[in-house]
Regions:
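Bacterial Sec-dependent N-terminal signal peptides
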Residues: 1-24, 182-186
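Short loop/turn motifs that connect adjacent beta-strands in outer-membrane beta-barrel proteins
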Residues: 19-25, 48, 87-103, 143-147
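Start-of-domain marker
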Residues: 20-73
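Residues that define the transmembrane beta-barrel architecture of outer-membrane proteins
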Residues: 22-28, 33-35, 72-78, 127-133, ...
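Transmembrane beta-strands of outer-membrane beta-barrel proteins
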Residues: 26-30, 47, 51-55, 78-80, ...
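Transmembrane beta-strands of outer-membrane beta-barrel pores
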Residues: 32-36, 55-61, 84-86, 110-116, ...
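Flexible, solvent-exposed loop segments that connect beta-strands
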Residues: 61-72, 112-127, 160-172
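Outer-membrane beta-barrel "beta-signal"
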Residues: 76-93, 174-186
């Protein structure tokens, strides 16, 4: 009887450890960082891929000849970002926490910043709408059960809709992205 009990226990423990790690079905949260505040939702597309949708405010600062004073502003931003979490199985096999998609990821961050509802310390300020595509690398780790932090970087392309603001032609440029955020998951 002892041999059967030991054998059944061993088989059950092997089956429990053989499960593949997967991203969460849905992760809803808020984050803040040095340059803004955002609300996000990550929805599972496959075991390793999640689609992050985000709405928030990016912060900015402008000064110079065209501005009578230094301008600090918050502009709305809408982001779609497919994320590939590539090390969930490795983290799971080492008994590290993978809840709320805690792991390393690569992504393509696609953001649109319109000239709507710009909040600033100067009246009647407007920004030029833009869209950006930034391949990125990042990590997310949990701090307790509901808090997390994220860090990442990437380089990509930004297209500026300058003609809509009265300029003679639209512009495009290379852009870098570095982010460090702390957040709360519901």
């Amino acid at each position: 009887m002892k041999k059967i009990t030991t054998l059944v226990s061993l088989c059950l423990s092997i089956l429990c450890n053989a499960q593949n790690a997967s991203v969460e079905k849905s992760v809803l949260g808020i984050q803040t960082g040095f340059l803004g505040i955002w609300a996000h939702n990550e929805s599972r597309l496959s075991n390793k891929i999640a689609l992050r949708s985000e709405i928030g405010f990016d912060a900015g600062y402008q000064s110079g000849f065209f501005y009578p004073e230094d301008v600090f502003f918050l502009a709305p931003v809408f982001t779609l970002e497919p994320r590939f979490y590539y090390n969930l199985n490795k983290r799971n096999s080492k008994s590290k926490v993978i809840t709320n998609n805690s792991g390393n990821f690569i992504s393509i961050k696609t953001s649109y910043t319109p000239d709507w509802l710009v909040i600033a310390n100067v009246k009647d300020i407007s920004i030029i709408s833009e869209i950006s595509f930034i391949p990125s690398f990042g990590i997310r780790r949990n701090i307790g059960t509901h808090f997390n932090y994220e860090a990442g970087f990437g380089f990509g392309y930004k297209y500026i809709f300058a003609k809509a603001a009265g300029y003679s032609k639209n512009e495009s440029e290379a852009i870098g992205n570095i982010h460090l955020r702390i957040g709360y998951v519901f």
